[in-house]
Every structure is written in structure tokens, then in C-alpha cells.
Amino acid sequence: MKQPLRVMIIPIVAWICQAGAQDLKPVQLPPPQKEIGKPLMQVLSLRHSSRDFDPKPLLPQDLSNLLWAADGINRGESGKRTAPSAMNWQETDVYVILSDGAFLYDAKANSLNPVIAGDVRALAGTQGFVKGAPLTLVYVVDYARMTKANDEDKKLYSAADVGFIAENAYLYCASQGFAVVVRGSVDRPVLSERLRLRPDQKIILAQTVGYPK
């Protein structure tokens, strides 16, 4: 009985290492806890940005809850998300940048699909605190999914959709007392290359999350 308990309380980075992040295997997240949190009006009063992060990695359960709140599936029969998207394009991908590598959030499987191994946190922001924070979410839009939209509409609607996701993450963090800040300062050319993005995939924003210092 002791071994399962130890596994459940280890931080997310160590947990990913045990799951084989270095050989690029998917990592299954625990089911999100949907019955937790403070009342909405209290959460709105608590929402704020913070740039002071404890370097301690997030626990697997906290990461699962955060990702579900940001853009998880809340209607299983239709696959629709906690954040709205124009025409239900669902054009935004959430990349999870940890000290061990970059992962792509799979909302349907509630899992992390490894993209690249290695610490690329410094590429997820130009401010000094980013490379020491445990987690940055990078919001990437895929214009190829936005069928029948012209170039101007793609930029407009995708930017709004990313904003909805980022605000969901903000509200979850406010509810749980986490530190969080959304940023436009990202080394887009270099990070896009490292994430192997296509020309029609664009990094819009990044959002750094962690326990408060």
C-alpha cells in the first residue's frame, strides 16, 4: 500500500519521468476534479497576475484540473469545451512546457502527448522569471481548421478564442490560490521551430503558472 501512495503525491515532472517522457510516450493525467473551487464572484474578486513562482512542479492532479478548466471537454456527447470557439473550430492547441520537455494537451484522452524532450522553458518567454517557473502554457492556433474564414477573420476569432482559454486558466488559478500571468512576450520564431509548427500554426499567447512563492 505504501508504493501507490508515494506515486500519487510526487510532482508532475518526476511523474512524467517515470512514465517515460524521454522516450516520448504519452502521459495519462488523472481525471479532473470538477466539484472543487470557490464561488464565481469570489474567484473574480481574487483574479490577478503574479510573476513570483515557487519552482516546485505542479502535482499531476493540479495540472489535470488546470488544463480541463482552461480548455477541457465539458460535454462529452459533442466534444465541446469549457472555452467557446467561433464556429466550434476548436483551432487552439495547448502546449504544456515543463522542465523535462514540451507536451501537447489532448483534451479527449485527458493526456499529455510529448513533442520534444529537454528544457525549453526559456523559449516560452523573454522575461527572466519564465525559465524558473514550473509550467508555461503556450496557446497555438491552427488556421487550417478555420474553414471558410478569410485571413482577417482567422486572426480576429482565434485571438478571441485564445483569450477565453487564458481567462479560464486565470479563474482556476484564482480559485486554487496559484500564481499565474498571461504574456505576449514569447520567442515565437525559435519556439515555433522547436515545437515543429507548420507555417499556418501560430503562437498567440503564453501563460505561466505555478504555486506562489
What label would you give each PLM region?
Residues 47, 66, 94, 135-139, ...:
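Small-aliphatic-rich amphipathic alpha-helix that forms the alpha element of a beta-alpha
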Residues 32, 140-142, 210-212:
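Generic beta-structure capping elements
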Residues 7-16:
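Bacterial N-terminal signal peptides
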Residues 1-6:
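Positively charged n-region of N-terminal signal peptides that target proteins for export
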Residues 17-21:
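Sec/Tat signal peptide C-region and signal peptidase I cleavage site
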Residues 22-133:
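N-terminal amphipathic, basic helical "cap/leader" segment at the start of enzyme domains
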Residues 196-213:
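A glycine-rich helix N-cap at a beta->alpha junction
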Residues 131-134, 200-202:
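Short coil/turn connectors at secondary-structure junctions
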